[in-house]
Amino acid sequence: MWRGRDVISARDFGRRDLEELFETARYMEKYSKSRLEFLRGRVMAVAFFEPSTRTRLSFEVAMRRLGGDVIGFWGAEGTSVEKGETLVDTVKMLDAYSDVIVVRHRYEGASKLAAEVAESPVINGGDGAFNHPTQAMLDVYTMWREFGTVDGLNVGLIGDLRHARTVNSLLETLTNFRVRVYLISPEYLRPRVETIDYVQSRGLKLSFHTNVEEVIHELDVLYVVRIQKERFIDPLEYEKVKGSYRITVDMLKNARRHLIILHPLPRVDEIDHRVDATPHARYFRQAALGVPLRMALLYLILQS
């Protein structure tokens, strides 16, 4: 089901796809610090037009752990892109050199365009404000590993839910499971209407809240994204809102004992650092699982 497929949108993958990916990732966990030879002789090209730490590094480590090689660039500086080379021409060049291409771009649809011109599979490493499918796969995989299932979970999403592309892809991925989602944000930072309409049409149960303390006692998972300061005209309004959506140790006193807190990272100040020492913190394990998850993804796409 996976071999040779592009990974452009979370909407393209169903439950069976995800379950196969998760089972393969769990196998890969045993080898996430070893070196295998599954992809020996294969080359992954990375075309990252935007900054990235975890996505880029986990893809690189994953490919090397599988025995493959990595080429590419991280930012346009020092490349022909800086001279004005188009995305299409850049992708065609990378396609000639590699077996799979990972693209990260600020413009929505960049990965889809790359897939249309490349013969090799293309993986969306994050584009525009609404797509980051492999992060969503990692987020749901972390839930699956923590609880043994995703079905039946109460999942809270808190912060700037409109402008975080991880949120959009996560909601789309969660439509494959029987979960209830609590959207916790100011009304003007809720996900865009198109996303809400789509996930509800797929049967995802949503409820809307402005205060996390009203619902924290019901949650199994709390997924935190930062409030994006650059979206506010009034700095005072930003400071007011930011403080209302910050996770603290005191806030967790009413949480379920098994609640896990996830974050796609990087964290700014939306989670108090003292939360790191609580049994609820799972965001660093979540980031670490990015290697076996992406090992599984590359293996399934490139397997002979």
Swiss-Prot record:
InterPro entries the UniProt entry points to: Asp/Orn_carbamoyltranf_P-bd, Asp/Orn_carbamoylTrfase, Asp/Orn_carbamoylTrfase_sf, Asp_carbamoyltransf, Asp_carbamoyltransf_Asp/Orn-bd
Source organism per UniProt: Pyrobaculum neutrophilum (strain DSM 2338 / JCM 9278 / NBRC 100436 / V24Sta) (Thermoproteus neutrophilus)
Name of the protein described by the UniProt record: Aspartate carbamoyltransferase catalytic subunit
Keyword Transport: no
First-tier enzyme category under EC: transferase
GO molecular function term, any single one: amino acid binding
Pathway: Pyrimidine metabolism; UMP biosynthesis via de novo pathway; (S)-dihydroorotate from bicarbonate: step 2/3
Annotated positions binding carbamoyl phosphate: R54, T55, R104, H132, Q135, L265, P266
